[in-house]
Regions:
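N-terminal [4Fe-4S]-dependent radical SAM core
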Residues: 2, 19, 58, 180-187
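Short N-terminal binding/cap micro-motifs at the start of the first secondary-structure element
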Residues: 14-22
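Short, charged N-terminal beta->alpha structural module
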Residues: 46-76
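Iron-sulfur (Fe-S) cluster-binding modules
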Residues: 1-5, 45-47
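Glycine-rich beta-alpha loop elements in corrinoid/cobalamin-binding modules
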Residues: 65, 76-187
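Short, hydrophobic/glycine-enriched beta-strand segments
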Residues: 3-14
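Detector for Asparagine
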Residues: 17, 54-56, 63, 92, ...
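A solvent-exposed, charged loop/short amphipathic helix patch at secondary-structure junctions
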Residues: 22-56, 103-127
């Protein structure tokens, strides 16, 4: 098991493999229990595939947010790995940086679909919370930082950061503060 200082990842709806359709990102907005179970399972199996990885479990493809943070931290001399959340068990990091787009399903597209379904939980909320809980359960002493365009949702849903055990929410251009933030987290 590799032990990098920092592991960067995202839930499977953010790291979605667009091999089958360019509209795959919209599937993350669909309420999970609004679909017939066999269709939902097939869709999850075919669309929410792990990102292509190398033999070490490191993601070969990742979103721009993760790659910008990775580059900033590598240039500062940190040991950083970007991996798909399906391969977390290959690593034991001190700091986990999570990128998110719509963590609680209240973005425009998702909230519309959730409203039409009568309020059922969307895939993006389910997988984001599952990822955070898994890291917290399996690596209780690690630091969890969350950033990305969806962090505004923590301001709207007061208490979610504490409920999920997230240590730090990063809003804004993280490249400017990443080095100092991570240095403090590692101390």
């Amino acid at each position: 098991m590799r032990t990098p200082e920092i592991l960067l990842t995202a839930d499977k709806t953010v790291m979605i493999n667009y091999r089958l359709t360019c509209l795959g990102g919209f599937v993350a907005c669909v309420p999970r229990k609004s679909l017939p179970v066999p269709f939902a399972k097939l869709m999850e199996k075919r669309l929410f595939l792990p990102a292509p990885t190398n033999e070490n479990g490191e993601a070969e493809l990742a979103n721009l947010f993760l790659r910008k943070v990775e580059t900033t931290l590598l240039e500062s001399g940190f040991d950083v790995v970007v991996c798909d959340s399906a391969y977390l068990d290959k690593f034991n990091a001190k700091v986990y940086g999570i990128s998110t787009i719509d963590p609680f399903g209240i973005g425009p597209a998702t909230s519309t679909m959730v409203g039409l379904s009568g309020g059922k939980e969307p895939f993006n909320k389910f997988y984001f919370e599952e990822l955070i809980r898994k890291i917290r359960r399996e690596r209780p002493d690690s630091i969890i930082m969350v950033g990305g365009p969806g962090v505004w949702q923590f301001d709207v849903l007061d208490g979610k950061q504490e409920e999920l055990g997230i240590d730090c929410i990063v809003e804004g251009e993280v490249e400017e503060i990443a080095q100092d933030l991570v240095k403090k987290a590692l101390e």
